[in-house]
């Protein structure tokens, strides 16, 4: 096998060009086995195998610097740069992350995981090279929907100013996570149809040279094209037409489903762990589709991640024009929602916590200053969410809860979530965000009659004395567990509070607690600095009330173990009880 002998790019160059397809097949075989056991980004990597081989065959990495956008398609790159064992040996599968990481290899230049950044990052590398009078090629790889992001277009716009070596590989697989949307992709389709000869050419209009490669999964054709642009003296785009999921029939047929996979059976392509349990995505989709049937002003908006809201292809078709995918463009999604709301519509925007940070300015400026009554639901905003350092979901509380006018809610159950949606989608007074709980969805069958328009009214779920435990969202269950343990171990009947509101204080209730409580505990699924608990502590600052804030430390974590992180932050019922008894 060729792959077993490759310890770096120099070994790729030793293989004859007509033998490189064998290497490509070996890479796919290894990726297939690994993905079937470990899961990971599937389609993007299968489509980039030949291009990755060609890049390392032609260029001199790491002197020539290759920057991958999102870097979810960097598995073949890692296999060719000294990390093959992480893809060949099951015991080493976790030796590498799912994205590029400079701590792993000198061939990786950035830790990235968000989209549309490679052109700007690589342009910075090229600018520094020029300032220092150095040489070498700088290559940005982008595609798989990433061109719909504003930063990608900003980067392309700037790239033409460089007037020096800068190579942009556009991996055009005619897909994002789902299908592509927007006029830009109509131009890419036209270029594919005309073999790159169409007069209307986005890249040329930006002042960039342009090369088209129709056979983007033909390693010989790619090597020829890359050799032509190597050592170029001005920015050039190499537009390659690839097939997402190439080499595995189920992935070629169902590209959206196979963008990312969990463990599966190789023969059938069926998941090994098929989750049939109801979750917040399916609940959201069902709710919105029903609402759309009765109200034509309701619109569901996504920024390239439709299934986060449960909108699979069939559901998107059912929603018709009341479902909008703006591409991977969170800023536009939020601004669009504001415009819809101002003109009398009822916009719903669903977004991962990790991605909402990309549109902080629009939430603040376009929505909250204008007091636009949008509904924005935050998914995976939890320590139980995605655990890659680039996709952490526990920074949204400090980020969103301190924006004026925004009402940020935290349900603990399905029923509370649906009640919040009922209120938010019909009210016209506030911008509303809802932070969904992490972990399995809890449904207790209760009927929630609370009027969420009466802002900042907490709910006392259990009346006690001496100690009050306020459990926000995900950690309301932890609050109940800690209270139960306190009763069992110390005979203390604690008050348990579900606050619902992240953005405001129930000052009347907090004041009342002073009468027969001396300790207040806050539990939140997010970082403590600037978070919910600090607001409670500040309220009690001049009093004798002891306040104990529990949440996460401000730090970047990567591929962490949830239980270990919870214990490290004393976020277990046993630790909370031990702490409070130690100061009582």
Question: What is the meaning of each model-derived region?
Answer:
Residues 263, 269-274, 385-387, 398, ...:
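Peripheral docking tails and interdomain loops at the edges
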């Amino acid at each position: 096998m060729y792959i077993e002998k490759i310890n770096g790019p120099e070994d790729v160059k030793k293989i004859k060009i007509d033998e490189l397809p064998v290497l490509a097949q070996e890479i796919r075989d290894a990726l297939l086995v690994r993905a079937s056991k470990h899961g990971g980004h599937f389609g993007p990597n299968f489509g980039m195998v030949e291009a990755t081989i060609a890049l390392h065959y032609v260029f001199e990495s790491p002197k020539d610097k290759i920057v991958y956008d999102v870097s979810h398609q960097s598995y073949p790159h890692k296999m060719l740069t000294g990390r093959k064992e992480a893809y060949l040996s099951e015991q080493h599968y976790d030796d590498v992350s799912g994205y590029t990481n400079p701590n792993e290899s000198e061939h990786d230049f950035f830790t990235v995981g968000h989209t549309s950044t490679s052109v700007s990052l690589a342009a910075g590398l090229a600018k520094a090279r020029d300032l220092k009078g150095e040489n070498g090629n700088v290559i940005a790889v982008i595609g798989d929907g990433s061109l719909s992001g504003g930063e990608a277009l900003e980067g392309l716009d700037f790239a033409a100013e460089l007037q020096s070596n800068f190579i942009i590989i556009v991996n055009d697989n005619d897909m994002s996570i789902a299908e592509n949307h927007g006029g830009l992709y109509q131009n890419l389709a036209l270029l594919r149809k005309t073999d790159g000869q169409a007069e209307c050419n986005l890249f040329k209009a930006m002042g960039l040279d342009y090369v088209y490669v129709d056979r983007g999964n033909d390693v010989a054709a790619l090597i020829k094209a890359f050799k032509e642009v190597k050592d170029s003296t001005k920015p050039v785009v190499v537009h390659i037409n690839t097939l997402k999921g190439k080499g595995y029939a189920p992935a070629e047929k169902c590209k959206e489903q196979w963008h990312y996979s969990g463990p599966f059976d190789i023969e059938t392509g069926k998941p090994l762990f098929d989750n049939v349990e109801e979750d917040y995505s399916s609940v959201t989709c069902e709710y919105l589709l029903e609402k759309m049937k009765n109200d034509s002003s309701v619109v569901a908006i996504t920024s390239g991640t439709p299934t986060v809201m449960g909108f699979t292809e069939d559901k998107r078709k059912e929603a018709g024009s009341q479902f909008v995918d703006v591409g991977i463009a969170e800023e536009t999604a939020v601004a669009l929602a504001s415009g819809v709301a101002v003109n009398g519509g009822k916009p719903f925007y669903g977004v991962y916590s990790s991605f909402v940070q990309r549109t902080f300015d629009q939430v603040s400026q376009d929505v909250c200053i204008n007091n636009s009554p949008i509904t924005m639901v935050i998914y995976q905003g939890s320590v139980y969410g995605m655990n890659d350092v680039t996709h952490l979901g526990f920074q949204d509380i400090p980020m969103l809860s301190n924006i004026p006018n925004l009402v940020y809610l935290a349900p603990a159950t399905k029923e509370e979530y649906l009640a919040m949606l009922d209120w938010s989608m019909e009210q016209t007074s506030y911008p509303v965000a809802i932070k969904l709980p992490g972990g399995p969805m809890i449904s207790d069958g209760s009927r929630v009659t609370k009027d969420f328009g009466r802002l900042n009214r907490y709910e006392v779920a259990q009346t006690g004395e001496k100690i009050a435990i306020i459990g926000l969202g995900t950690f309301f269950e932890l609050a109940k567990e800690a209270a139960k343990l306190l009763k069992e171990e110390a005979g203390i009947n604690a008050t348990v509070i579900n606050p619902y509101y992240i953005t405001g204080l129930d000052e009347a209730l907090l004041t009342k607690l002073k009468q027969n409580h001396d300790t207040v505990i806050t539990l939140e699924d997010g970082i403590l600095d600037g978070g919910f608990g600090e607001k409670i502590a500040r309220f009690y600052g001049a009093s004798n009330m002891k306040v104990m804030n529990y949440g996460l430390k401000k730090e970047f974590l990567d591929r962490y173990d949830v239980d270990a992180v919870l214990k490290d932050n004393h976020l277990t019922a046993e630790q909370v009880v031990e702490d409070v008894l130690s100061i009582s």
